[in-house]
A protein has these predicted regions:
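Cytochrome P450 substrate-recognition site 1
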Residues: 2-20, 25-118, 122, 140-145, ...
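Cytochrome P450 heme-binding "Cys pocket" and the immediately downstream C-terminal segment
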Residues: 280-282, 389-390, 402, 407-446
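Cytochrome P450 I-helix active-site segment
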Residues: 3-13, 120, 171-178, 225-233, ...
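Cytochrome P450 heme-thiolate monooxygenase catalytic core
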Residues: 72-80, 114-269, 285
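Conserved cytochrome P450 K-helix/beta-meander segment immediately N-terminal to the heme-binding cysteine loop
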Residues: 66, 358-385
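Conserved cytochrome P450 K-helix E-x-x-R motif and the immediately C-terminal K′/meander segment
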Residues: 16-37, 211, 215, 297-345, ...
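C-terminal helix/juxtamembrane-tail motif
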Residues: 444-458
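Short, small-residue alpha-helix embedded
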Residues: 264-277, 417
Length: 458
């Protein structure tokens, strides 16, 4: 017989409205997962929301024969900006398949090899910038890494340099932050409040983002090239199944979606810097690997697969920082079967149409899987140790057919930047006691984390 899903005590009529802070939702869910374990639920104004924070249940929910991505809440809200793009399309929208078949080949590992040099050289510009800051500097690495992410995303995928590493911040960065932060907050407010008091923020951000996309489209049309990149495919390719191509509006949808999707990367890398400042022995081991593999020569694409310890650092940073903090799942609808859906071999049950949010703050730190789950240990993310981990704790990029289409791009970007940071510069935390602080944004990121940076001492 199924047992009740744990739930915090609530208020009459209002339910658990005080248990989740709408201005910092993921931090609230992290705390609830630490208290209630593998599964819990809340009820707000009569609506039930179920959360899974255990690795075994998360793996079960990733069975695509039983469950699928649920497009709801913030994802529906961001459709105002990007419509039925890859990230936001409903499961039954034909546009998802058309867009996916056009885009996926351009983000494959074989195509990304062509972009390695671009990633490396632009990252080197930031390293040189950091090395030239002089004594007693203080930087917030997240800000510089956001700039780097936009610069590399735009150049590798759309073929245009923004020269955004210095000078005023590109307006797209703030617009992207405004649009996504508003998307995550809108479902927590009454609709009339969104219309009366908050509509302008999303509209303004959307206008900036779509103008940026339109500029890139026009730039390519005005400057024809034989460059084979994502923008070329968006503008010229036809879906091999339907023969359809994308309209300019749909092209802009996907251009805007790309930096939103890749925004997890600077969050991860800033967190990785934090973990490295806290674990100098990890830096020593990584540099020994880098010196053995690359030496004093030029960092080349062929080196990436040889950097096993650096890859372990990246994966362990993904596990502990969970920059994309969760994803939504729902049972696959079946009009002929309205029975409750069983989880955990019948230990729990949910309604046939109940959406579930997987909370990676819990899943990635499940003590049933990880010994000392809060410790930063790259070794557990390497080789056989990594292969033996359950699939449920490797869902940093989502799951199945709706997994992040830019996964390989993100992994290569993260490896390139992480390698060059460890190889070229030394970081010192301004506040050695800093703890990971979240601010309620779309992604989890280290807020108000500052470091001193200088050329690596050899």
């Amino acid at each position: 017989m199924s047992q009740p899903i744990p739930q915090p005590p609530g208020l009459p009529l209002l339910g658990n409205i005080k248990d989740v802070d709408p201005s910092n939702t993921w931090l609230s869910l992290k705390k609830l997962s630490e208290k209630y374990g593998e599964i819990f639920q809340i009820k707000v104004l009569g609506k039930t929301i179920v959360f899974v924070a255990g690795a075994a249940l998360a793996e079960e929910l990733c069975d695509e024969k039983r469950f699928r991505k649920f497009v709801g809440g913030p994802i529906v809200e961001i459709r105002y900006t990007v419509h039925d793009s890859l990230f936001t399309a409903f499961d039954d929208e034909a546009s998802w398949g058309i867009h996916h078949r056009i885009i996926a080949p351009m983000l494959s590992t074989s195509m990304l090899a062509d972009h390695f040099t671009e990633m490396r050289d632009i990252t080197n510009e930031l390293m040189e910038q950091w090395k030239g800051l002089g004594a007693n500097n203080k930087i917030a690495p997240l800000g510089d890494l956001n700039r780097l992410n936009l610069e590399i995303t735009t150049y590798t995928l759309e073929g245009k340099r923004l020269n955004n590493l210095t000078g005023p911040e590109h307006p797209v960065i703030k617009a992207m932050e405004d649009a996504t932060s508003e998307a995550i907050k809108r479902p927590t407010r009454p609709g009339i409040f969104n219309w009366l008091f908050y509509g302008g923020k999303l509209k303004s951000a959307t206008k900036t983002l779509r103008a940026f996309g339109a500029e890139l489209v026009q730039y390519r049309k005005d400057n024809p090239t034989d460059r084979r990149d994502l923008l070329d495919a968006l503008l010229t390719a036809k879906d091999p199944e339907t023969g359809k191509s994308l309209t300019d509006a749909q092209v802009i949808d996907e251009i805007v979606t790309m930096p939103i999707g890749s925004s997890t990367a600077p969050c991860l890398l800033a967190s990785a810097i934090l973990f490295l400042t806290q674990n100098p022995d990890v830096v020593t081991k990584a540099r020994a690997e880098l010196d053995a593999v690359i030496g004093s020569g030029k960092f080349e694409y062929a080196h990436l697969t040889q950097l096993k310890y650096v890859e372990g650092i990246m994966r362990e940073a993904l596990r502990l920082s969970f920059p994309a903090p969760g994803f939504n799942i729902e049972p696959i609808p079946n009009a002929a079967d309205k029975k409750p859906v069983l989880l955990g071999g019948g230990k729990y049950q949910i309604a046939h149409d109940q959406a579930v949010i997987i909370v990676l703050a819990g899943v990635n730190r499940d003590p049933e899987v990880f010994d000392e789950p809060l410790a930063f240990r790259p070794e557990r993310m390497m080789g056989e140790a990594f292969e033996q981990l359950p699939a449920g704790v490797k869902k940093w990029f989502g799951n199945g057919k709706r997994e992040c289409i830019g996964k390989h791009w993100a992994e290569q970007f993260n490896m390139v930047v992480l390698t060059q940071m460890i190889r070229d510069v030394d970081f010192e935390a301004v506040d050695p006691g800093y703890k990971l602080v979240q601010d309620g944004w779309f992604n989890v990121r280290p807020i108000d984390f500052h470091v001193k940076v200088k050329p690596r001492e050899v």
